[in-house]
Amino acid sequence: YLVSPAAYAALGAYMFLLILIGFPVNFLTLYVTLEHKKLRTPLNYILLNLAVADLFMVLGGFTTTMYTSMHGYFVLGRLGCNLEGFFATLGGEIALWSLVVLAIERWIVVCKPISKFRFTEDNAIMGLAFSWVMALACAVPPLVGWLRYIPEGMQCTCGVDYYTRAEGFDNESFVIYMFIVHFLIPLSVIFFCYGRLLCAVKEAAAAQQESETTQRAEKEVSRMVVIMVIGFLVCWLPYASVAWWIFCNQGSDFGPIFMTLPSFFAKRPAIYNPMIYICMNKQFRHCMI
């Protein structure tokens, strides 16, 4: 054991709790939305995509981690490590790029940079396809030789290899690609869209350009998406920061807990994304009841 058996037991219990909550609430989100026609709006397609991403993390990642934590190390071999790392990365990236699509949708709908534009079903499907393509562009390369997935932290979960420094082993290019294309760029787009959105909401309120009902509806949707973005950042920024520090300080000594804590902190979006959607969407709650 790298740490005490009690730490592995706590980790297993934590993963069991995430599965116990994450699977039902995400499945409920999918079921209720597909069951009620009035919930099948273009915007909700993107929110459903978040639920699918969370289920990937729950079924492909959390179950594996709970099982390996019972043994105190990653017992599933290279194939299991690749699958766990792939599903965890894919789920996180689908969620991130879905939030990018939601931010762009909110910016276009509220700020109206394109006159008479409506976010249609075709636009939503294009957004879904875009989020999957970008997520796969991050999750697949380690499977085909551009870097690799390895056990990290307490060795119960797998992630991208930020650590190895050896002759003939080049991990710099992929890590830089991932941080720029799959972290900094999407976050920059999100911050730009919501910066413009806040300005537009204040201007519309001051000018009273739209009805009070319309303004209230747009504000509620925007508030829900903003909270999802904040939650994503709270969970993923510690992991990204620690991973970047390890990459920039390869060869430095650090304990297994150093990477384990932010790694498992980053798994919580699978729970809070659907709970935010359920708590802040009155129409969904009405259909659920």
Swiss-Prot record:
UniProt-listed GO biological process terms: absorption of visible light; G protein-coupled opsin signaling pathway; visual perception
Domain of life: Eukaryota
Residue positions, PTM N6-(retinylidene)lysine: 267
One annotated GO molecular function: G protein-coupled photoreceptor activity
Predominant location category: membrane
Residue intervals annotated with topology Extracellular: 1-7, 68-81, 145-173, 246-257
TM ranges: 8-32, 45-67, 82-104, 124-144, 174-195, 224-245, 258-279
PANTHER family on file: OPSIN
Function: Photoreceptor required for image-forming vision at low light intensity. While most salt water fish species use retinal as chromophore, most freshwater fish use 3-dehydroretinal, or a mixture of retinal and 3-dehydroretinal. Light-induced isomerization of 11-cis to all-trans retinal triggers a conformational change that activates signaling via G-proteins. Subsequent receptor phosphorylation mediates displacement of the bound G-protein alpha subunit by arrestin and terminates signaling.
The protein, known as: Rhodopsin
Organism for this UniProt entry: Batrachocottus nikolskii (Fat sculpin)
